[in-house]
Amino acid sequence: MTTAQKPLKETAAQWLGLNRATVAVLVVIGCLGLSEEVWSNFLALHLNDRTGSILRAAEYTGLIYSATNLLEGFGYIIGGRIAHSMGARLALAISAVPMSIGFMIMLAADSPWAIAFGSVLMTNWEPLSVPATFDIVGSEVPKNRRTIAFAVQSIQKRLPKVIGPAIGAAAFAAIGYWLNLTIAFGLVGVAVVLQLFLTNRMQPKGKTSPVPFRTIMRDMPRELRMLLSAEVFIRWGDWFVRGFSGLYVLNLLITEYHWEKSSAIYAVGWLVAITNLTALATYIPIAKLVDRSKSPRPFIGLTFLLFAVFPVSLVMMPRFATAFGLPVIVALGFTYVVNGLRELGEPARKALIANGFPPAVRARAVGLYWGLRSFAFFPAPLVAGYLWARIGPDATFVIASVIGLMGTAWYAVSSKAAARLS
């Protein structure tokens, strides 16, 4: 490497908030994320095959996602405690354990209840790892580079969401769901090997003092309390549609537009990929714009608004397309682009949270923040499954948008109050 090349590479790494620790985290998150995306987007379709009823599949889906959110609440808090007391390396290693157990259950079982139990375990790698990633970014990356560092992490999480659904759709349509699980289980093995190799460069955690939860709650900044309360509304609306959108689109294309099932499955996979490609295109430019802005609040508010718009768009856009003689897939593609644009403010929101807590308690505080959020909205998918069966998916999705708009309005009011106080 020449002298001229070295500063250029160092500058690029610094510009992106990259160093050894953050690169190790990116690799681990990327592998585990790809593993999840290969199977999770097709879980509702697999349950539909197993139960033989779209309503039963919706009920199981609601139960699974409610249990997942409840367990995630504990996972975030436990992950924060591990990262605080034992360090990020151990927290990242432990995050792969429940996923591995879940895969073994899913591969061995055929009962919808066993599938539900295994899938809940499989989705809980992220809450165990999130406090560690915040701790690493907060301690290893300068404050003026944290938004871009979170944007790079978001890209690394989104890349699997682009590749995974395409791989999963091909596997599910060609062979069956067991192939999705087998591919995903293999990716977990790759993640564990890379994790052991890459994270040995991370410094061990020094001695830390225990921090009571009541102290963290008492010292949580007012702005973060307001953000948390608004997020609860947003996540309630989001979870009314998140686990059900693939099932909704599949049923729409097959029953109303008479698509072949295999073609509809491929469409679901590619629509998810469109969402994630859209999000990928926004992360870096928006993150740099946020870094240069006086406040991240407008970007967060726009994100919340787009969260609220997606469910009602999923209901209305296909009808508009039919009325104007356009292919339904064009309307669905536009809707999923809107769904991808809602990630505009995610790096800004994460940077706001990371900057809001002092370094000594950051990992534990982030775990508590995420945990409280998960506890608050964990019933949402269960309620959505109930409403789907009682009043239908269209009405359920409209209710989701109303809840999201309530959260957006509350954040707009509370952020103005926070701006006046700052």
Segments (PLM) and residue ranges:
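Symmetry-related core transmembrane helices of the 12-TM Major Facilitator Superfamily/SLC fold
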Residues: 180-198, 396-412
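Helix-loop boundary and gating motifs at the non-cytosolic
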Residues: 8-70, 224-272
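Helix-to-loop junctions at the C-terminal end of transmembrane segments
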Residues: 75-87, 172, 281-295, 388
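Residue-level signature of mid-helix packing/kink "hotspots" within the transmembrane helices
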Residues: 69-77, 161-162, 276-284, 377-378
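C-terminal transmembrane helical hairpin of 12-TM major facilitator-type secondary transporters
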Residues: 297-345
